[in-house]
Amino acid sequence: ALGQYMTPAPIAAFMASLFPKNFGAFHLLDAGAGEGSLTCSFLKALRHTDRSFPHGEASLFEYDVDMARKLEKNIIQAVEGLPVKPHIYHTDFIEYASTLVLHKQRLFTHAILNPPYKKISGHSAHRALLRDAGIETVNLYTAFVALSLALLRPGGTLVAIIPRSFCNGAYYRPFRQYILRHSAIRRLHL
Protein backbone atom coordinates (compact mmCIF):
# COMPACT_ATOMS: atom_id res chain seq x y z
CA ALA A 1 0.00 0.00 0.00
CA LEU A 2 3.03 2.29 0.35
CA GLY A 3 4.02 1.90 -3.31
CA GLN A 4 7.36 0.27 -2.51
CA TYR A 5 9.42 -1.76 -4.98
CA MET A 6 12.65 -3.33 -3.74
CA THR A 7 15.84 -2.91 -5.75
CA PRO A 8 17.64 -6.14 -6.73
CA ALA A 9 21.34 -6.24 -5.79
CA PRO A 10 22.68 -6.15 -9.39
CA ILE A 11 20.65 -3.02 -10.16
CA ALA A 12 21.70 -1.38 -6.88
CA ALA A 13 25.36 -2.10 -7.72
CA PHE A 14 24.91 -0.62 -11.20
CA MET A 15 23.34 2.51 -9.74
CA ALA A 16 26.19 2.92 -7.25
CA SER A 17 28.69 2.64 -10.12
CA LEU A 18 27.15 5.72 -11.79
CA PHE A 19 28.46 8.19 -9.22
CA PRO A 20 31.61 10.17 -10.05
CA LYS A 21 34.72 8.45 -8.76
CA ASN A 22 36.45 11.51 -7.35
CA PHE A 23 34.95 12.96 -4.21
CA GLY A 24 35.97 13.66 -0.65
CA ALA A 25 33.70 13.91 2.35
CA PHE A 26 30.12 13.11 1.41
CA HIS A 27 26.59 13.10 2.75
CA LEU A 28 24.40 10.53 1.00
CA LEU A 29 20.59 10.71 0.91
CA ASP A 30 18.58 7.51 0.47
CA ALA A 31 14.89 8.48 0.47
CA GLY A 32 12.57 5.49 0.75
CA ALA A 33 15.51 3.29 1.69
CA GLY A 34 13.65 0.01 2.12
CA GLU A 35 16.12 -2.56 3.42
CA GLY A 36 19.07 -0.36 2.43
CA SER A 37 20.24 -2.11 -0.72
CA LEU A 38 21.10 1.16 -2.50
CA THR A 39 23.14 2.61 0.36
CA CYS A 40 24.81 -0.76 0.97
CA SER A 41 25.82 -0.87 -2.71
CA PHE A 42 27.13 2.70 -2.54
CA LEU A 43 29.25 1.81 0.51
CA LYS A 44 30.43 -1.43 -1.08
CA ALA A 45 31.59 0.53 -4.12
CA LEU A 46 33.56 2.82 -1.79
CA ARG A 47 35.28 -0.19 -0.22
CA HIS A 48 36.40 -1.47 -3.62
CA THR A 49 38.04 1.68 -4.95
CA ASP A 50 41.38 3.34 -4.48
CA ARG A 51 39.80 6.63 -3.57
CA SER A 52 40.03 7.78 -0.02
CA PHE A 53 37.65 10.07 1.78
CA PRO A 54 38.04 11.66 5.19
CA HIS A 55 34.54 10.76 6.35
CA GLY A 56 30.98 10.41 5.19
CA GLU A 57 27.42 10.43 6.36
CA ALA A 58 24.38 8.57 5.10
CA SER A 59 20.83 9.72 5.83
CA LEU A 60 18.25 7.04 5.15
CA PHE A 61 14.49 7.48 5.31
CA GLU A 62 12.12 4.55 5.72
CA TYR A 63 8.53 4.95 6.86
CA ASP A 64 7.60 1.24 7.05
CA VAL A 65 8.39 -0.03 10.56
CA ASP A 66 9.11 -3.64 9.55
CA MET A 67 11.35 -2.53 6.71
CA ALA A 68 13.15 -0.08 9.00
CA ARG A 69 14.22 -2.91 11.33
CA LYS A 70 15.91 -4.72 8.44
CA LEU A 71 17.39 -1.43 7.26
CA GLU A 72 19.05 -0.77 10.62
CA LYS A 73 20.63 -4.23 10.68
CA ASN A 74 21.90 -3.97 7.10
CA ILE A 75 23.35 -0.48 7.50
CA ILE A 76 25.15 -1.31 10.75
CA GLN A 77 26.92 -4.13 8.88
CA ALA A 78 27.59 -1.99 5.79
CA VAL A 79 29.33 0.86 7.64
CA GLU A 80 31.52 -1.44 9.74
CA GLY A 81 35.14 -0.36 9.32
CA LEU A 82 34.24 2.73 7.26
CA PRO A 83 34.42 6.34 8.48
CA VAL A 84 30.71 6.72 7.74
CA LYS A 85 28.04 7.83 10.20
CA PRO A 86 24.54 6.58 9.38
CA HIS A 87 21.37 8.47 10.30
CA ILE A 88 18.19 6.41 9.97
CA TYR A 89 14.91 8.31 10.05
CA HIS A 90 11.60 6.52 10.69
CA THR A 91 9.55 9.40 9.39
CA ASP A 92 7.62 10.62 6.38
CA PHE A 93 10.21 11.82 3.85
CA ILE A 94 7.86 14.30 2.18
CA GLU A 95 7.02 16.00 5.49
CA TYR A 96 10.67 16.11 6.57
CA ALA A 97 12.15 17.14 3.23
CA SER A 98 9.56 19.78 2.35
CA THR A 99 10.41 21.59 5.60
CA LEU A 100 14.10 21.52 4.71
CA VAL A 101 13.35 22.81 1.21
CA LEU A 102 11.27 25.69 2.61
CA HIS A 103 14.26 26.66 4.77
CA LYS A 104 16.64 26.30 1.80
CA GLN A 105 18.66 23.55 3.46
CA ARG A 106 20.92 21.83 0.93
CA LEU A 107 22.51 19.10 2.98
CA PHE A 108 23.48 16.31 0.61
CA THR A 109 26.30 15.72 -1.86
CA HIS A 110 24.83 12.48 -3.22
CA ALA A 111 21.35 10.99 -3.47
CA ILE A 112 20.43 7.47 -4.51
CA LEU A 113 16.85 6.32 -4.66
CA ASN A 114 14.24 3.95 -5.92
CA PRO A 115 11.25 6.00 -4.82
CA PRO A 116 7.78 4.64 -4.12
CA TYR A 117 5.35 4.66 -7.05
CA LYS A 118 1.88 5.78 -6.05
CA LYS A 119 -0.50 8.57 -7.01
CA ILE A 120 -0.87 11.54 -4.69
CA SER A 121 -4.40 12.77 -4.08
CA GLY A 122 -4.96 16.34 -5.21
CA HIS A 123 -6.35 17.28 -1.80
CA SER A 124 -3.86 15.41 0.41
CA ALA A 125 -1.53 16.84 3.03
CA HIS A 126 1.41 15.66 0.92
CA ARG A 127 0.18 17.62 -2.09
CA ALA A 128 -0.13 20.77 0.03
CA LEU A 129 3.37 20.35 1.50
CA LEU A 130 4.84 19.85 -1.96
CA ARG A 131 3.07 22.92 -3.35
CA ASP A 132 4.40 24.98 -0.45
CA ALA A 133 7.90 23.75 -1.36
CA GLY A 134 7.38 24.79 -5.00
CA ILE A 135 6.85 21.27 -6.33
CA GLU A 136 3.77 20.41 -8.37
CA THR A 137 3.39 16.67 -8.92
CA VAL A 138 0.90 13.81 -9.06
CA ASN A 139 3.01 10.84 -7.96
CA LEU A 140 5.24 9.90 -5.05
CA TYR A 141 8.17 9.03 -7.32
CA THR A 142 8.30 12.51 -8.83
CA ALA A 143 7.87 14.06 -5.38
CA PHE A 144 10.80 12.09 -3.97
CA VAL A 145 13.04 12.92 -6.93
CA ALA A 146 12.16 16.64 -6.90
CA LEU A 147 12.67 16.92 -3.13
CA SER A 148 15.98 15.05 -3.38
CA LEU A 149 17.17 17.41 -6.12
CA ALA A 150 16.18 20.39 -4.00
CA LEU A 151 18.20 19.04 -1.07
CA LEU A 152 21.41 18.49 -3.04
CA ARG A 153 24.30 20.88 -2.61
CA PRO A 154 25.50 22.64 -5.78
CA GLY A 155 27.40 20.09 -7.86
CA GLY A 156 25.67 17.18 -6.11
CA THR A 157 24.72 13.97 -7.91
CA LEU A 158 21.41 12.11 -7.91
CA VAL A 159 20.98 8.58 -9.25
CA ALA A 160 17.40 7.31 -9.31
CA ILE A 161 15.16 4.66 -10.80
CA ILE A 162 12.12 6.33 -12.32
CA PRO A 163 9.63 5.14 -14.93
CA ARG A 164 9.84 6.68 -18.36
CA SER A 165 6.27 7.96 -18.00
CA PHE A 166 7.74 11.25 -16.75
CA CYS A 167 9.03 11.92 -20.28
CA ASN A 168 5.65 12.71 -21.82
CA GLY A 169 2.14 13.83 -21.07
CA ALA A 170 0.61 16.81 -19.33
CA TYR A 171 0.60 15.19 -15.86
CA TYR A 172 4.38 15.22 -15.64
CA ARG A 173 5.08 18.53 -17.42
CA PRO A 174 5.64 20.43 -14.13
CA PHE A 175 8.07 17.71 -12.99
CA ARG A 176 9.99 17.85 -16.29
CA GLN A 177 10.21 21.63 -16.01
CA TYR A 178 11.43 21.29 -12.42
CA ILE A 179 14.17 18.87 -13.45
CA LEU A 180 15.34 21.11 -16.27
CA ARG A 181 15.38 24.21 -14.03
CA HIS A 182 17.19 22.58 -11.11
CA SER A 183 19.53 20.00 -12.61
CA ALA A 184 21.39 18.73 -15.63
CA ILE A 185 20.69 15.22 -16.89
CA ARG A 186 24.06 13.60 -17.54
CA ARG A 187 22.94 10.05 -18.25
CA LEU A 188 19.78 8.08 -18.93
CA HIS A 189 19.77 4.29 -18.87
CA LEU A 190 16.74 2.58 -20.38
Where are these predicted regions, by residue range?
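Short alpha-helical oligomerization interface
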Residues: H126-G134
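Conserved proline-anchored active-site loop of SAM-dependent methyltransferases
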Residues: M15, L28-L43, D64, D92-Y96, ...
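Glycine-rich phosphate-binding loop signature in dinucleotide/nucleotide-binding domains
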Residues: N22-F23, L102-R106
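Conserved beta-strand segments of alpha/beta enzyme cores
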Residues: E57, K85-H87, A184-R187
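A short helix->loop->beta-strand "cap" motif at the edges of active sites that frequently abuts
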Residues: H55-G56, G156
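Conserved Class I SAM-dependent methyltransferase catalytic core
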Residues: S37, Y63, M67-K70, T137-L190
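Conserved SAM-binding strand-loop segment of SAM-dependent methyltransferases
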Residues: L82-F93
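Class I S-adenosyl-L-methionine
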Residues: A1-R51, S59-A78, A97, P115, ...
